Amino acid sequence: MSTKIKGELFPSRSLVSKKWTFLLCFGSFCFGILFTDRMWIIPESKDMPRPSVSTEAERLKLISEGCDPKTLYQKEVNRDPQALFGEVSKTHNAIQTLDKTISSLEMELAAARSAQESLVNGAPISNDMEKKQLPGKRRYLMVVGINTAFSSRKRRDSVRTTWMPSGEKRKKLEEEKGIIIRFVIGHSATAGGILDRSIEAEDKKHGDFLRLDHVEGYLELSGKTKTYFSTAVSKWDAEFYVKVDDDVHVNIATLGETLVRHRKKHRVYLGCMKSGPVLSQKGVRYHEPEYWKFGENGNKYFRHATGQLYAISRDLASYISLNQHVLHKYANEDVTLGAWFIGLDVTHIDDRRLCCGTPPDCEWKAQAGNICVASFDWTCSGICRSADRIKEVHKRCGEPENAIWKARF
């Protein structure tokens, strides 16, 4: 076969004849039809449900069982109000149980973070902490931290001979009643100096100190309080943590009985609640350098527990431990603690038995059967000349000597 171009003949360059072209096209067409039919055929399955029939059957089943939407609505309208109230109560109880569980988990998380922080900072975890992390750990009722200073040796001795059990009795108090009592003190500006060595010798004799990683100083009481709660909650697992000054008389059994009444409550902040003026004038006692944060001159502080004695529950102590690096400190320690809680959902409990006066006030109340938890003189922010007078206060206002051993917590 040839092709004529401009009068010349050339041989054909077609490689495929018309016959072969026709056969290839026809074969491709047939293959395409076969493939298309295979793709679009829907296989019949015995297991595949028929939507319309199944939906109708389920609807009929629901109606037969009394679950028709109209029937359910009518039941809700005609339901007994008392039954509804019962269900609401059950739901409320379930929510409370869940809230307790969440609080427990939060406390365990805070304790775990405190332990982790101790490891990161290179501080060894105490034996008490190790025991606390084991299954069946000991839960104490309360930890009582007695705030003291290097110069208060006479006050400490007077406390040991009055309301604070010493020696074997103190150990028995811990084992049988779950009450920990310690004098709380940090270290001097020159660590390892004569003041620190004096405390170490006293602690070796009595074994009743809780040493803090804190530099002692009157203007550092807010920081000391924060460090105390953070240290105590990581060292002992207790329901309550108490702070008291070393010039205050305390009836331990009455304190324990008071706290037990609030053990089912969450985020407890207990003390003698007060509100005083914000002092902006320099040079006066209780001057507040950041007075401008509390509003105009003449304003008063928000309600907070007086600093002589107060108690907080474990969840609040854990909160302080967890957030200690961001909690702001004001000049006055009791105001500072109240400020940490002012924005939280805290249960404030005002109990005036925590701030009785010295005799005759606390004596009259004791004779009437209303024994005070704590006694001190407001004019001195503690018992005036406490080292000399606390024995008299204990004699006239103290609970019976065996009260703590008869108490059930």
Swiss-Prot record:
GO CC terms of this entry: Golgi membrane
EC annotation from Swiss-Prot or TrEMBL: 2.4.1.-
Source superkingdom: Eukaryota
Pfam families: DUF4094 (PF13334), Galactosyl_T (PF01762)
InterPro entries: DUF4094, Glyco_trans_31
Location(s) in or outside the cell: Golgi apparatus membrane
Pathway info: Protein modification; protein glycosylation
GO biological processes: protein glycosylation
The keyword Transmembrane helix is assigned to this record: yes
Annotated Gene3D superfamilies: 3.90.550.50
Record key words, sorted: Glycosyltransferase, Golgi apparatus, Manganese, Membrane, Signal-anchor, Transferase, Transmembrane, Transmembrane helix
Cofactor(s) for this UniProt protein: Mn(2+)
Principal location listed in the UniProt entry: Golgi
Enzyme class: transferase
Membrane topology value: Single-pass type II membrane protein
Described function: Beta-1,3-galactosyltransferase that transfers galactose from UDP-galactose to substrates with a terminal glycosyl residue.
PANTHER family: BETA-1,3-GALACTOSYLTRANSFERASE 3-RELATED, BETA-1,3-N-ACETYLGLUCOSAMINYLTRANSFERASE
Protein family (similarity comment): Belongs to the glycosyltransferase 31 family.
Name of the protein this chain belongs to: Probable beta-1,3-galactosyltransferase 3
Originating species: Arabidopsis thaliana
